[in-house]
A protein has these predicted regions:
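Extreme N-terminal, non-catalytic leader segments
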Residues: 1-35, 40
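Post-Walker A helix-loop "phosphate-sensing" segment adjacent to the P-loop in P-loop NTPases
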Residues: 53-63
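Small-molecule kinase domains that catalyze NTP-dependent phosphoryl transfer to phosphate-bearing small molecules
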Residues: 1, 153, 183-197
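Conserved nucleotide-sensing/catalytic segment adjacent to the nucleotide-binding pocket
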Residues: 63-66, 70-125
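Hydrophobic positions on the alpha1 helix immediately C-terminal to the Walker A/P-loop
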Residues: 47
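ATP-dependent NMP and nucleoside kinases share a basic, alpha-helical "lid"
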Residues: 131-183
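Conserved lysine of the Walker
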Residues: 44
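Active-site signature of alpha/beta-hydrolase-fold catalytic machinery across serine-
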Residues: 50
Length: 197
């Protein structure tokens, strides 16, 4: 696409498009699950939204789900330590597999793949660590795009038909990460820099 300085996809297997199209056309009940992952602030959500716009422009039904909503509720831990930054400084790794509700994520993905809708949790990324159970209504559409670090964890990665890894230059990621940490996640810049490093 001309509006991007660098290509979105470095390489696409030539047989992929053919297999992808045949799978959707030949099996009307089949759901296609696409997992998009990459390091923090690599552009997973942005790419996901671009895919959604493109698919909707083609008048095809699509659902989008973020694995960030499957973070464990850590509100009590944050209260205990006073704030998220102190909790992290004491060894809590928000990107570790144990920080996610992976069994629930797997179950929800399999339910979507079977053609049934789900009520997904909603994690509130404002520094409180609150996760609200069954808060988001997600429809099982023909194409289901799931983005987030957790998509490629061992517990769930086999559920996806297509897996995409987003690779972004480190300086771009750092700038995005710091901006998001301060403006969206209620962190101060000093602690956000510490978390990045």
């Amino acid at each position: 696409d001309k509006k991007y300085d660098t290509p979105i996809f470095k390489e696409v297997n030539p047989n992929f498009i053919s297999r992808f199209t045949k799978r959707l056309i030949n099996n009307p009940t089949k759901r296609l699950l696409v997992g998009i992952t990459g390091e923090s602030a690599s552009g997973k959500s942005t790419i996901c939204q671009e895919i959604k716009k493109t698919i909707e422009h083609l008048n095809m039904p699509i659902s989008v789900l973020s694995t960030d909503n499957y973070f464990n509720d850590i509100s009590e831990l944050i209260k205990k330590y006073g704030c998220f930054d102190t909790l992290r400084d004491n060894g809590y790794d928000i990107d570790a597999p144990e920080s996610f509700q992976l069994q629930l994520l797997r179950s929800d993905l399999l339910t979507l793949a079977s053609g049934k809708n789900i009520m997904a949790p909603r994690y509130i990324p404002n520094g409180t660590g609150v996760s609200v159970p069954r808060a988001l209504d997600v429809n099982s559409q023909k194409i289901i795009v799931v983005e987030g670090i957790a998509t490629m964890y061992e517990e769930v990665r086999d559920v996806f038909d297509v897996k995409v890894y987003i690779e972004t230059e480190n300086d771009i990621r750092k700038e995005r990460f710091l901006k998001r940490a301060v403006t969206e996640r209620n962190q101060n810049e000093e602690n956000a820099i510490k978390q990045w490093e």
